Amino acid sequence: MSTSPGEKAAVLVEALPYIRRYNDQVVVVKYGGNALAGASEDDALAIFAEDIVLMRQVGMRPVVVHGGGPQISSLMARLGKVAEFRDGRRVTDAETVDIARMVLIGQVNPQLVAAINVHGTIAVGVSGEDAGLIRAVPRDPDLGFVGDVDRIDPTILRALLDDGFVPVVATIGTDESGQAYNINADTVAGAIAEALDAEKLVYLTDIEGLRRVVDDPASLIRQTTPDELDALMADGTIAGGMIPKVESCVHAVRAGVRRAHVLDGRIPHVLLLEVFTDEGIGTMVL
């Protein structure tokens, strides 16, 4: 069914106060491979790129932080390596960290940059290794070359944003000696949002949002607080791969990021629905 001119105008009018509110504000968006579940990769990526470009064109300052877990696992399988995870983090030996670098920096990052740049040369790919962006420390000897964020130097990101570009960040960090570490992209997104004093931190995933009862869609949490999320992690309601996302939301909001969101990246234009409509979508943490 076609949309009438009046309905189209109403959509634009509804977006106007949000365009004003978020003008010149940083929004960090974590784009993960799981956000592509249920849709063709090309279509999902093109729609995501359109959202990012529109956000930039109306005066927002988006930063994209990406994962690549499914792609890393796929290449590992082709090479005969078995992926192992503990609490949502990949166990990473020396060969695996090289595979992660190849996939994140050499495959996923250029794909995202190219998709955004279809609409104009505004995206620039960077790695956490560039300009000392992500300084890493080992997380746990049992995880191998899996790192935690020691500190973020946002200088290169601020320079790109000030020049009108959209940074697209691959989440490989290095320690003081230059050793590369694979860092969970959810964790990096939260740390970058804090370093840039972001207005919003957004996670795109393959679920509609957070639930109080895992198997009950009616228990979707529309709005929550860091304290409630702490309780849901403590009682096991939030577990597995969702833990890094939720921990990062909690830490970022407590550190001064105004809003954090968990959205279903399979929904077309979900970013625009969250940012520019009255109802919003998914789960908001504040």
Name these PLM-found stretches.
Residues I281-L286:
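A glycine- and small/hydrophobic-rich beta-loop-beta segment
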Residues M1-R266, L273, T277-E279:
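Nucleotide/pyrophosphate-binding catalytic subdomain
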